[in-house]
Structures are given as structure tokens and as C-alpha cells.
Curated annotation (Swiss-Prot):
Residue sites binding Mg(2+) 2 per the record: 417
One biological process term in Gene Ontology: lysyl-tRNA aminoacylation
Protein family per UniProt: Belongs to the class-II aminoacyl-tRNA synthetase family.
This protein's name: Lysine--tRNA ligase
CC annotations in GO: cytosol
Top-level class of the enzyme under EC nomenclature: ligase
Binding site for Mg(2+) 1: 410, 417
UniProt entry tagged with the keyword Cell membrane: no
């Protein structure tokens, strides 16, 4: 056992002894259930922070606060609540039992304090401790007592401690909540109806991904955690709800990375009588307005860059983007869609770029891999990439002028994809054929290919109006708004391998 662990265990034992003493003296004081708080710290700072010492003395304002003890310096405590921090002062009026209980306080304890509001000589607000109650005894010391909470893995595993001691983490999740609320309000103002669709599917669909499999005991059948809500949302459009959206979790049984977590949050929406061009316009309007509302500016720092949500956003086809970011590659510069349709040409090109190939990859998959390796990381400013091949877009409508590609886009910023949208395929026969092609791809070894969904085909046969739909990755969007570079920093409890 290390000296560090021994010291920590000693402190835990001391704190347990203090709690046992409280239980012995008065069991009701060990974990009291009631404390009436009149103000949060930030409210007091906002209302009285500009008053002079003399004005506060004359006012004689009584307040009641509650929060966690973050520092104890002689008679002064620093108390933190959800809004911020304020001091409490245990001066000469603190005598007898109150003084003894104050001396037993530890950093991390949760307390309530009542008393008059004052201003210190340094200009800091504080509450004179005229009445005090221990609300919860913290049995474990906060990490900065020893080494601080700087280890990233510990921050993710013990998010509750991370939130206590790291203001940056608290602010990131406050911003996340604001981003989600702003998106929801924007969609409602645009007359979209918020809906909820199943989280467990009999047939996984709506995206190309490997699903999580579970078992329904009562029905004795396999079910799948949803990889996307798309097919259910489009059923609602068939049913007559012309504008719908859902903000919820998706689950994909894939690897962990700075951009991927097995469960993640998406906002997915569908609008009848619109196409993918309308979606791009709506996305520009949404993101620029949210940035201005939440940050006061359409521009925000992201790493070494400044990204500008103000618009208009760049729009390039996938082929154009590959050519733009490979200016020295003569083969790419001369490449045409006819060559893109040649699988051997595409395999040779991908190999020449150092891309490890899978046997089952189609021409579209090869084009997407080349794009992902050579162009995607360079898309720092908001950019719509269009012209996605039909063989990697099984739910998107074919382009009228080039049936090799679809009316689909993905939205990139900060070098990563944030959104995916397209004009929906509403031709039931074409959808049937594409589902069958996906089944063949799965049989050939592509475990992310889609399943055949006969009920969805039936829904399309009832008539889906011209419709466009889009999914926006909330986690990746929040990464931009908080200037963070790993998805784990914006998910409260990210997936972690169990500790040994």
C-alpha cells in the first residue's frame, strides 16, 4: 500500500469517526432532511456585489445559503453551490456547541449557513455564521488534498468528483444543456413536432452500423438497441405528421475514439415537401443563430483555429473535395465519375494512398475512404459535402442528373462530420432493391450493412411525400461549442472498460 493511499485511508477513518460521533450525540443531525435556502451564491453576488461595506452594514440583510465546503481558512469557509461560490465567516459570535461543530468541519462537507451578509476588507461578500447545520458529511477527501484530479481516466470514471472540483467541466455540461435547449426551441419555432420513437427494434435500421443485441424474455426473441430512429420517423411522415424531430440516444456497437462513444445523442428531423438543399439552408440558419444566442458571436475558437458559423457555408461534392485537397496528385485531378465507377481503378488509387482495403468495399465505399483520409481532416470551417454515391446511401434519393450519386450531404466542421442529411428515397421499389443490395453486402462480410425491413417497404407503399431528413450529432456539436477535442469531455458518463 502506497503512502498516498495510507494517508487517504487515515482521513477517511477520521471522517467516519466524526460522523459516528454525530450519530451518537444526535442521530437526526447525521443526515438532516431539511434546510431552507433563500439565495444561491450567484444571486447574492449579482444583487449585492456592488454595495459598499457600509451599505451592507446598514442594510442588515439576512440570508440563508447551502453548498459544499471547498476551502477552510481559519474562520473563513468557501462554499460552492450550483451557481458559484461565496464565503461564510465563523467569527466571535461562534461559541460553544456551534464552535465545536465548526471545528469538526472538513473540506467536501455540505452545510447550510444563515446570517447577515457582509463585505470583507478585500471586497468579498460573506455570510456571518449565526446559524449553521451540517447537511451531509463527506467521508472521502476531495482529490486536490493529495494530487488534484488531473488524470483523465479518473475524471471520466468519477465524474461526480470532476464536477465538484473542475469548473471547466461544469461549464462544459452547462453549455451542453443550453445547446440542446436552443436546438429544441429552434425546431419548435419552425413548427416541428417533438416525438419519441422506440429504443428497441426488431430490425435495426436507419444507418450503416453494427447494433447491440439483447433478448426479450417474454417474447423470446432477439431485439436490437436502435442505431438510428430514421425509419420510424419517416413512418410518421407517411402517417401525416409533416415535420417531426427527436432528440435521443443511439447505440452502435463500435470502437471507442475521441469522436466515438457506443451511446451518443442525436437530433434527427424530417420535413415533408422539402429537399436536401432546404436542409442545408436550415442548418446554416440554426447553427448561426444558436452560436450568436449562446456565445454572443458567430465566431468561436476551436483549438488553434477560429471557426465561423456566420455563413454562407462552403458546398463541395465529395469528388470536388478530394480534388481540392490533393492538388499534387495528377490521377485524382483528372478523375471523373466514370472512373469512380470502376472498382479496380478505385482500389488501385486507394492502395496508392496507403489505405488498407476491405475485399467487400464498393466503388462508393472506396471514394468515401479516400475522402476520409485525404480531405475530411482539413475541413475546419463549416462545409457541406454533397454527391455521396448511392451504394453508401441506401435510404437517400438518387440525383436526377447522375444516378451514381444521391441528393445527400454531410456537414463538416473542425475536421469532423457533425450532421448527415438527404432528400429521402420514397420510391418503394428502389428502396426494396437497395435493401436487397445491403443484404448481399452483409452476406459478403460487411457487418455494418443494413437489414431488410419489409414493414418499412409497406409504409413507403402507402406513400411518403417528397421529404428531406437530417441527423445532427449533439455530442460533436457540443465539442465545438466548448472547444474540447474528445467526445468523453462532453458526455457525463462515457463508456469505460471496467477497472481490474
Amino acid at each position: 500500500m502506497t503512502e498516498l493511499v495510507q494517508d487517504e485511508n487515515k482521513l477517511i477513518a477520521e471522517r467516519r469517526a466524526k460522523l459516528d460521533h454525530i450519530r451518537t450525540q444526535c442521530p437526526a443531525n447525521a443526515h438532516p432532511n431539511t434546510w431552507e435556502r433563500s439565495h444561491k451564491a450567484a444571486e447574492l453576488q449579482a444583487q449585492y456585489g456592488e454595495n459598499t461595506k457600509e451599505e451592507l452594514e446598514a442594510l442588515g440583510y439576512q440570508t440563508s445559503i447551502a453548498g459544499r465546503v471547498m476551502a477552510k481558512r481559519g474562520p473563513f469557509l468557501v462554499i460552492q453551490d450550483v451557481s458559484g461560490r461565496i464565503q461564510a465567516y465563523a467569527g466571535k459570535p461562534v461559541q460553544g456547541d456551534l464552535k465545536e461543530r465548526y471545528q469538526g468541519l472538513d473540506i467536501g462537507d455540505i452545510i447550510g449557513v444563515k446570517g447577515q451578509l457582509h463585505l470583507s476588507g478585500k471586497g468579498d461578500l460573506y455570510v456571518n455564521m449565526e446559524e449553521y447545520q451540517l447537511l451531509t458529511k463527506a467521508l472521502r477527501p476531495l482529490p486536490e488534498k493529495f494530487h488534484g484530479l488531473t488524470d483523465q481516466e479518473t475524471r471520466y470514471r468519477q465524474r461526480y468528483v470532476d464536477l465538484i472540483v473542475n469548473e471547466e467541466s461544469r461549464n462544459a455540461f452547462i453549455m451542453r444543456s443550453k445547446v440542446v435547449s436552443a436546438i429544441r426551441n429552434f425546431m419548435i419555432k419552425k413548427e416541428f413536432m417533438e416525438v419519441e420513437t422506440p429504443m428497441m427494434h426488431v430490425i435495426p435500421g436507419g444507418a450503416s452500423a453494427r447494433p447491440f443485441v439483447t433478448h426479450h424474455n417474454a417474447l423470446d426473441m432477439a431485439m436490437y438497441l436502435r442505431i438510428a430512429p430514421e425509419l420510424y420517423l419517416k413512418r410518421l411522415v407517411v402517417g401525416g405528421f409533416e415535420r417531426v424531430f427527436e432528440i435521443n440516444r443511439n447505440f452502435r456497437n463500435e470502437g471507442l475514439s475521441p469522436r466515438h462513444n457506443p451511446e451518443f445523442t442525436m437530433m434527427e428531423f424530417y420535413m415533408a415537401y422539402a429537399d436536401y438543399q432546404d436542409l442545408m439552408d436550415l442548418t446554416e440558419e440554426m447553427l448561426s443563430s444558436i452560436a450568436i444566442d449562446l456565445l454572443g458571436s458567430a465566431q468561436m475558437p476551436y483549438g488553434e483555429h477560429t471557426v465561423d458559423f456566420g455563413g454562407p457555408y462552403a458546398r463541395l461534392s465529395m469528388l470536388e473535395a478530394i480534388q481540392k485537397y490533393n492538388p499534387e496528385n495528377a490521377t485524382i485531378q483528372a478523375m471523373t465519375y466514370e472512373q469512380v465507377k470502376d472498382v479496380e481503378f478505385m482500389r488501385d488509387l486507394a492502395s496508392s494512398l496507403g489505405i488498407k482495403l476491405e475485399k467487400f468495399w464498393t466503388c462508393g465505399q472506396l471514394l468515401e475512404e479516400i475522402f476520409g483520409e485525404t480531405a475530411e481532416p482539413k475541413l475546419m470551417q463549416p462545409t457541406f459535402i454533397t454527391g455521396y454515391p448511392a451504394d453508401i446511401s441506401p435510404l437517400a434519393r438518387r440525383n436526377d442528373n447522375n444516378d451514381f450519386i444521391t441528393d445527400r450531404f454531410e456537414f463538416f466542421i473542425g475536421g469532423r462530420e457533425v450532421a448527415n442529411g438527404f432528400s429521402e428515397l420514397n420510391d418503394a421499389q428502389d428502396q426494396d432493391n437497395r435493401f436487397k443490395a445491403q443484404v448481399n453486402a452483409k452476406d459478403a462480410g460487411d457487418d455494418e450493412a443494413m437489414f431488410y425491413d419489409a414493414d418499412y417497404i409497406t409504409a413507403l407503399e402507402h406513400g411518403l411525400p417528397p421529404t428531406a431528413g437530417q441527423g445532427i450529432g449533439i455530442d460533436r456539436l457540443v465539442m465545438l461549442f466548448t472547444n474540447t477535442h474528445t467526445i468523453r469531455d462532453v458526455i457525463l458518463f462515457p463508456a469505460m472498460r471496467p477497472q481490474a
